[in-house]
Amino acid sequence: MRILVVFGSHRLGGTNAEIEKVMKAKSDKFDFDFVHLADHKIESCTSCHQCGKTGRCTLPISDNDRFQEIFDKMKTADAIFIISPVYAAIPSRLTALFERLTSVLYDSGVMNTDINPLLDKKAAIFSYCSCGICDDTPMKIIFDKFVMKNYRFDKSTYSYLNASKKPQDEYPNITAYVMSTLKQLC
């Protein structure tokens, strides 16, 4: 099973490195593709709506922008894990990724059909901060709004692998939470 793991942090190392190391120890069961947004430039959407004609983001931006590369990986993955710290809000590169996904999926009409390539993907979203695991419900709601066929901010309706109501009470740290969720795919 191919799992795309998107780390939303602006920093390399730290908690992300710990999680990646533990996940790699399970590489005999899973084919992981790790994307660290700290290594990738994601430009903000300009609402040019050209993706509505092509189904791909055609934003005339620098060659360093990696949105389409990440989107293509999302489409081919069997499962998507988004792991991100919460500083004061969602990190800006992760927000830009969500924003661009919205435009490509919505403007191309994919959201109004049954061909959304991300619609029934297995997904898990994890939030953490310096004091431990954070409530990931707000980020799940944002992901629903931006990516899935929902467009509601009041509640999450996408079926996540990590549906725990209070993960901070169930797990000692974010790594244990991620690995517990990963076991569901075995």
Predicted regions and their residues:
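Short, glycine-/small-residue-rich phosphate/pyrophosphate-handling segment
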Residues: V110-S156
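Short, solvent-exposed coil/turn elements at secondary-structure transition points
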Residues: A38-H40, C129, S159-S164
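N-terminal beta1-alpha1-beta2 submodule of the flavodoxin-like/Rossmannoid cofactor-binding fold
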Residues: M1-S84, A88-Y106, V110-M111, K166-C186
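Short beta-strand elements in bilobed, periplasmic/extracellular small-molecule ligand-binding domains
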Residues: D31-H36, N150-L161
